[in-house]
Amino acid sequence: MIKNKLKKIILTGIIAVTAFGLIGCGKDSKKTKEVNVGYFNNITHAQALMMKAEGTLDKSLGDDVSVKWTAFNAGPAEVEALFSGDIDIGYIGPVPAISANVKSKGDVVIISSATKGGAVLVKRKGADINSVADLDGKVVAIPQIGNTQHLCLLKLLADNGLKPDTSGGTVKVSAVANADVANTIERGDIDAALVPEPWGATLLANDAEMVLDYNEIFENGEYDVAVVVARKEFMEENPEIVDEFLKQHEAATKKVNDDKENSLKTINNELKEATGKSLGDDIISEAFERIGVSTEVNEESVTGFADISKSEGFISELPEGELICR
C-alpha cells in the first residue's frame, strides 16, 4: 500500500514538473520582438505589397519576430505614426520623408528607394494644352498639397515662367483625390492633372490626353516617387531586423524586375484582398511601363525636392545631418 502511494506521489510530481516545463517552453516560443511596417495600397509601394502577399519578411525573420503591416492613405498620417513609434519602417513619398526627417531632427531617415517616376501630366480631351506654358490660366489637379506630384508641378511651372494663383500667378492648382480626378475632368472642373500611376493609365484609358510623359516630369523620370524610411532608434536597437528587411526588400525588387508578369498578378491580387478592387491587366501593365522599381536612392532628386519644399514653405529648414542612411 505504501509503495503504491509512493508511486502515485512520484508520478504526480513527474506530471506536474513536465506540465510546468511545457508551460515554460510555451512562453519561450512566443515572439519576443515586433516590427511594424507602414505602406500604401498603391503600386508604387510594389515591394511592400509583394512581401505582404508572399509572407517573405515574416518567414525570413523567424519565430522570434512578428511583422505587423499597417496601410495608410496619406503621407502625413504615416509620418505621425513614425513619430509616435506606431511604425518602425515605412514606404512613403520622398517629400513627406524629407518633412519627417526635418521635424524629427534627423531621427527618421531614408534607408532605400522603392520606385521611381510613375507620374504623368494629362489634359481633358480637346483642351488647348500642348505644353506646360499652355497651363497659363488653367486649372490643374494634383493629389495633395505639398506631396511629390505637387512639387513636380511647381517646378514645371517655375521652369516655364508660371506661378500658381496662390503666389500671384495664373495657374489654379487644385487638390483632388486620385479616385475623383476622372469625374472632375469629365465635369470640366479641371483642365489638366499631374497624377501618379495607376491613375495616369486609368485617365488615359478614359479619354484624357497626354501632355507630359513620366520622363518629362522631373529628373527624366529617375526621381524617387516612393522611398523606405526608418526610425534611427529602431535601427540602433534592432540592426539585424533592419538588415533582414532590406534583404527582403532587395529580393522583392529583383523579383518584380525579373518576373514582371507574375509579380504584377501578385501585386494586383494583394490590392484586391486589401481594397476589394483590382486593376485591369492592361492598366497595371501600362502603369509599370512608367514606374522604375529600384533600391538605389537618387540623391539629386531628393535634394531637389528638399530645396523646393523649403522655397515653397512646406518645411522650415533644409535637412541637417543624415537624411539618407546607406
What are these regions (language model features)?
Residues 31-165, 170-175, 191-197, 211:
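Short, glycine-/small- and polar/acidic-enriched structural segments
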